[in-house]
A protein has these predicted regions:
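Helical anchoring/docking segments at protein termini
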Residues: 1-51, 223-244
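Terminal, low-structured helical/coil segments at or just beyond the last alpha-helical repeat
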Residues: 9-11, 181-244
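N-terminal topogenic membrane-targeting module
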Residues: 25-28, 36-107, 111-114
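Solenoid-like repeat scaffolds
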Residues: 42-47, 77-85, 113-120, 146-152, ...
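Alpha-helical linker/edge segments of TPR/alpha-solenoid repeat scaffolds
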Residues: 50, 67, 97-108, 135-143, ...
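Alpha-helical adaptor scaffolds
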Residues: 82, 86-163
């Protein structure tokens, strides 16, 4: 947010400074303030982008190499940048929460995921699933309601939300939720299939979402699919320890 405040202050100073110096009137002062803000924001964004992109690329390489602790530290080191770049902190906390969860640090994961941006659909879905498994259905549905409102075309989010509603015998609400999603994405096959299943009073299936679904821990995968715990996209799983 510092960036917005700084750009606004600079733009207003330049725009209305000209008015005070009698260079232009009120209308031009407002116009030039907007122009100065846009120019300042572009310059600022370019500067921070040149720092952020290499840092994120380094984190990706660390995760692909299975260097989980190092990747977590790199993400933590970027948190101060969240004071300057809007929404960045929430995205970083989302990545850190996913990383902590798939590293087996559940308590730390929940703490981080609570601070994740509502637009980080995968992180918010995971947090809701953890609460649901812990029996806190109210909190789970609060998280899902907001996440679904923000991520309106996230098929797995909507289907998982409906699955949990159906699980607690709120099938009518589950149908209404999927119907709402199908208005935006009428050709989504997994959603159409689950909608039909709900209408026929049969069990929903999430197999179409493959390991992304099973990694949430609400259902066990078929034995043919192997071990359930998987890292997020772009992550490598930590090596198995010998003797276990």
């Amino acid at each position: 947010m510092y960036s917005v405040i700084l750009c606004s202050a600079l733009a207003l100073s330049l725009g209305f400074g000209g008015f005070l110096l009698d260079w232009w009137g009120w209308g031009w002062a407002i116009f030039f303030s907007l122009i100065f803000f846009v120019v300042g924001w572009i310059l600022f964004a370019r500067r921070f982008s040149s720092r952020l992109q290499p840092a994120m690329a380094a984190v990706q390489r660390q995760m692909q190499a299975g260097q989980w602790d190092l990747a977590m530290q790199s993400l933590e080191d970027m948190l101060p940048m969240g004071k300057w770049i809007p929404l960045l902190r929430g995205q970083l906390l989302a990545q850190m929460g996913l990383l902590a969860y798939h590293s087996g640090k559940k308590d730390k994961a929940m703490e981080l995921l609570e601070g994740a941006s509502a637009r980080a659909a995968d992180a918010r879905l995971l947090l809701a699933c953890i609460h649901f498994k812990n029996g806190d259905h109210k909190r789970a549905f609060e998280i899902l309601q907001l996440a679904a409102a923000v991520n309106r075309k996230h098929a797995m989010l909507y289907n998982a939300y409906a699955w949990m509603l159906h699980k607690v015998e709120r099938s009518d609400e589950a149908q209404a939720l999927l119907a709402k999603f199908l208005k935006r994405d009428p050709n989504n096959a997994p959603t159409k299939d689950n909608m039909l299943r709900l209408q026929n009073r049969t069990r929903m299936t999430m197999q179409a979402f493959d390991m992304q679904w099973y990694a949430l821990g609400l259902e066990q995968p078929p034995q043919s699919m192997g071990q359930v715990r998987r890292a997020p996209k772009g992550f490598r799983e930590p090596p198995k320890q010998r003797g276990r």
